[in-house]
Amino acid sequence: VAMEYSPMGNIPYISRVDAGTIEIVRECGVEIVSSGDLVNSFEARWTEEQRRDNFEVAKIMRGAVDSAFAFVKENVLSHNRITEYDVQQYMVQVMKRAGINAGGPNVSVDANTANPHYGPRKEGSAEVKEGSFVLIDFVARADKPNAVYSDFTWVGYVGASVPEKYVKTWNIVKGARDAAVEFMRTSFAEGKTIHGYEVDDVARKYITDRGYGDYFLHRTGHNIGREGHGNGVHMDDFESHDDRRLLPASGFTVEPGLYFETFGVRTEVN
């Protein structure tokens, strides 16, 4: 019997049946196996309509991010004081005008970019000014019941020349991202089965080989569905060991990052 159970709790997202129920079923002489791949198959595959809507929203999101960076540039050059929260709310309005409810993007600068779960508040947000390193993590979906999310992260620098520490870190993070994506493309082309943890291993090895493994503080990616973090396979051999298979027509992020005391760099693609 396949149940929402994961041996040794390897994948806690799908391990939802309590231990007592497992014991009762086993006492009936029934073998229990994980329903992980079934959940992945039924919940993670996108329809063609979902894929089209996702791509359209992604284009709108890219336009909103470009507009946000232009908003920052205009205000900084005009010596107008703006904060992370101001940029966030500007983006929310841009998306509303496009008919998309995007919630509140994570707009962070400098030391706040080192917190992967940061979210600006109206009171106490940091100022965005010349010399700021900016990170924008942005989630949105079409206004339809079955629409799936798009989820991206961009980084930028407010100034004419980007300091070397940001360039160096960006190149490492980008290299890890591209290595993970290329691993998947090559494996699919060769007809190989890919498991979520393998994608994480590729990105993590790339970063570790360059001496920064201790600063990569989260999994490489997560499933995307009607929830921002869906129930399908995650690119994870760090927070959990996700041994589920990547399936055609499913969506997920690839988002390695490096986080230091004074700044963090993450790139996120779908």
Q: What is the predicted role of each segment?
A:
Residues 1-270:
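Active-site neighborhoods and metal-handling regions in enzymes and metal-associated proteins
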